[in-house]
Amino acid sequence: SDVAANTEMSQKVLIGFACNPNVYGVVIIGLGCETVPHKALREKIQAMTDKPVVSFGIQEEGGTLKTIEKAVRAARDMAAEAALMQKEECDISELLLGIECGGSDATSGMASNPAVGELSDLLVGMGASTIMSESIEWIGGEHLVAKRAATPEIHNQIIKVCEDYEKHLKAAGQDCRAGQPTPGNKAGGLSTLDEKSLGCIRKGGTRPI
């Protein structure tokens, strides 16, 4: 069981994965009594895409092994169908690049992140779009990200994302700076969340947001 807001977010994330254009088909397995029912999830995905989607409930199918057998068979059928697809050219304006952290150390903000930011700028300049994830890792550098906002409204939204996340953690008695940087980040030479954030935001390049 879960609170409604978390359940809704879980569904949105799963639907987002399923609708990703890099995914040919979807096989969903559920227990049968969870707060995100596999049938409802399947129907929502089908309403948003025409890709093949099937779902199985362990309790309905008669156990785990029977469910796995059917799911594997369905996945193999989809893989065979996907192998027959032909590549098609598309306009670069249809390209959306997701930018994700790869484990930060003292060199990330000087080398790898700026390189990714340069790629982002090149693609955006050609008409593509990029998304920089992990807004928690903007904290301490969000004012620099906000400076790139194309409008005052977007500027305020960027600041609000970070403020809301900190408020959410504080309401639960947590401090985002207590767990950031991670032990691995510190072993790599980072000392504070602000330092990590200044490197993180370099991934986003310099183009207007």
Question: Which residues are covered by each model-predicted region?
Answer:
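Metallocofactor- and cofactor-centric catalytic cores in central/energy metabolism, strongly enriched
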Residues: 1-209
